[in-house]
């Protein structure tokens, strides 16, 4: 007997942040499975215009993590509930600058993290995805 996978697509309240609405890609911004939220890789998209930022890496990381925060809050969770994060940088030499901004969003007790470097689509300097616990922030990840 195969167990049914109960998953629900989640989307940001701001439609400008939903890449699947702007393209014909087979993409959802995130899904909820049980007590977990899985957010797809997010790019530095300006929430006011829907345009990609190609500014300094600090700006791109800040926009991307702010969008991730918005997405988690749209799903009833928060950055404090993130248990795993994956950062891709187009240029690994920018890791120190990325870390500086990252610490603004995760100042204490950061989640598990992996950082890779590779060429990214559309000239993006970063792409970030995460896994978080669903539900309101109770100060706990467990």
Language model features with spans:
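N-terminal presequence-like segments and the immediate start of the first folded domain
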Residues: 1-66, 70-80, 89-142
């Amino acid at each position: 007997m195969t167990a049914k996978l109960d998953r629900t697509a989640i989307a940001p309240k701001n439609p400008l942040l939903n890449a699947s609405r702007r393209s014909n890609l087979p993409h959802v911004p995130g899904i909820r499975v049980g007590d977990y939220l899985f957010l797809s890789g997010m790019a530095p998209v300006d929430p006011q215009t829907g345009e990609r930022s190609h500014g300094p890496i600090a700006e791109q990381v800040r926009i991307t993590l702010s969008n991730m925060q918005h997405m988690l809050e749209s799903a009833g969770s928060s950055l404090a509930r993130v248990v795993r994060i994956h950062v891709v940088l187009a240029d690994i030499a920018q890791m120190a600058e990325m870390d500086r901004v990252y610490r603004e969003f995760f100042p204490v007790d950061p989640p598990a993290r992996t950082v890779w470097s590779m060429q990214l689509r559309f000239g993006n300097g970063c792409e970030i995805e995460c896994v978080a616990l669903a539900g309101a922030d109770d100060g706990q990840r467990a």
